Amino acid sequence: MPAELSPIDTAKFAAARRAVDLVQDGMKLGLGTGSTAAWMVRCLAERVREEGLRVQGVPTSTRTAELARALGIQVVTLDEAKWLDLTIDGADEFDADFNLIKGGGAALLQEKIVATASDRMVVIADAAKEVAHLGAFPLPVEVIPFGWQSTKMLIEETLEGMDVLGREVTLRLSGDAPLLTDEKNYILDLHLKRIGEPRKLGLALNQIAGVVENGLFIDICDTVVVGHGDGRVSLRDLQSGQAEEGFIDMDRARNIFADLGD
């Protein structure tokens, strides 16, 4: 077991641990993708193992599916589950209205499909992910490989009429080749610095031929759980306006840390 977690990993663990407390027996769950979501999967597996919690998980990526299966969580497809009680996922950024940028892990398409097929979406994040305005993190846009350069030009043209501070568009690479999503598509990263009207931008991007989906999640997230490096955690619900503060006992994490290889 590692001697001590870094403050950022402590924050991610704290958020994940608190969010998993929302899971009830018999639920069908959307399992997010990314480093914070991986903590959530481990925390969920601990409850399955120690409490006999019965859940079905719908992963949002191949790597999440592999982790969930390895830890003993029952994995099903969204077609098998049909509808979900709860999705727990991370975010690259979120604002005061719980609008999100997601897709840093290149799983934005499945993440958005799963989140919108859920009664509730809970986002888990460290405090650094909260921003006044979206856009400092590059906005991912998933595009069809065929004619991607033409699609890129249309995106750049669309950005000319948008309230953004930057307009650079780059193809995401894996080594020297384009990164491929689980659906074998490409990712274009939009370096916008600040997005003034995220709803308008999201709608405009999805009207472009060749665009599959974009990483703006608008009116999808219901609850945000924010972790801090000292183990503090806050839960905020958009609909009720309520906020809860708490503290995660890091000593309880020993059996989770034990299965970490790095």
From Swiss-Prot:
Gene3D superfamilies: 3.30.70.260, 3.40.50.1360
Keywords: Isomerase
Species the sequence originates in: Cereibacter sphaeroides (strain KD131 / KCTC 12085)
Disulphide connectivity of cysteines: none
Residues in the signal sequence: none
MF annotations from Gene Ontology: ribose-5-phosphate isomerase activity
First-level EC class: isomerase
Oligomeric form and interacting partners: Homodimer.
Record function comment: Catalyzes the reversible conversion of ribose-5-phosphate to ribulose 5-phosphate.
Pfam family of the protein (one): Rib_5-P_isom_A
Source organism, top-level taxon: Bacteria
Protein name, UniProt field: Ribose-5-phosphate isomerase A
